[in-house]
Curated annotation (Swiss-Prot):
MF terms in GO: dioxygenase activity
GO biological process: 3-phenylpropionate catabolic process
Family assignment from sequence similarity: Belongs to the bacterial ring-hydroxylating dioxygenase beta subunit family.
Keywords tagged on the record: Aromatic hydrocarbons catabolism, Dioxygenase, Oxidoreductase, Plasmid
Protein name: Naphthalene 1,2-dioxygenase system, small oxygenase component
Protein's gene: ndoC
Keyword Oxidoreductase: yes
Protein's pathway: Aromatic compound metabolism; naphthalene degradation
Organism per entry: Pseudomonas fluorescens
Keyword Oxidoreductase: yes
Job description of the protein: Component of the naphthalene dioxygenase (NDO) multicomponent enzyme system which catalyzes the incorporation of both atoms of molecular oxygen into naphthalene to form cis-(1R,2S)-dihydroxy-1,2-dihydronaphthalene. The beta subunit seems to have a structural role in the holoenzyme.
Transmembrane spans: none
Length: 158
């Protein structure tokens, strides 16, 4: 299967390449294993077991990136702007500092305590064709964060 990005004008070359990686390398057992790991990780984060998460789910060589993509109308694309920027770009040590900050009793943002619920969906997994130690995983995440009373924030990620 090929995706023609000229005909399907809304499909970026990156998205087409990512789709084909997972389409051509489907492995149900690998996908189930990735789903289980992501679900366990989400549960640890939901119950705010941050040190356990860091110890059991995060490797010392991690590069944790959260990227925000700018969605613009076609008429605005004539201007050359960065379409993506890092919200987070952290290594293991920076994540460890972030965890300790969250657990600090002086951290005013945790009073009253926040409640989280993560939904992990559309998990896909594929081994890298050039590096047998590299696993590509893609998923969608919906995060609900409940604060005081009825204040709820919802975040979406893919």
């Amino acid at each position: 299967m090929m995706i023609n990005t000229q005909e399907d004008k809304l499909v970026s070359a990156h998205d087409a390449e990512e789709f084909l990686r997972f389409f051509n390398c489907h492995d149900s057992a690998l996908q189930q294993e990735a789903t289980t790991l992501l679900t366990r990780e989400a549960h640890l984060l939901d119950i705010q077991a941050y040190r356990t998460w860091l110890e059991h789910c995060v490797g010392s060589e991690v590069q944790y990136q959260v990227i925000s993509r700018e969605l613009r109308a076609a008429s605005e694309r004539r201007y050359k702007l960065n379409e993506a920027m890092n919200v987070y770009n952290e290594n293991f040590q920076q994540l460890k500092v972030r965890v300790e900050h969250q657990l600090d009793s002086q951290n005013w943002s945790n009073s009253p305590k926040l409640r989280f619920t993560r939904f992990i969906t559309n998990v896909q997994a594929a081994m890298d064709v050039n590096d047998e130690d590299l696993l590509h995983v893609r998923s969608n995440v919906v995060l609900h964060r409940a604060r005081r009373g009825n204040q709820v924030d919802v975040f979406y990620a893919a």
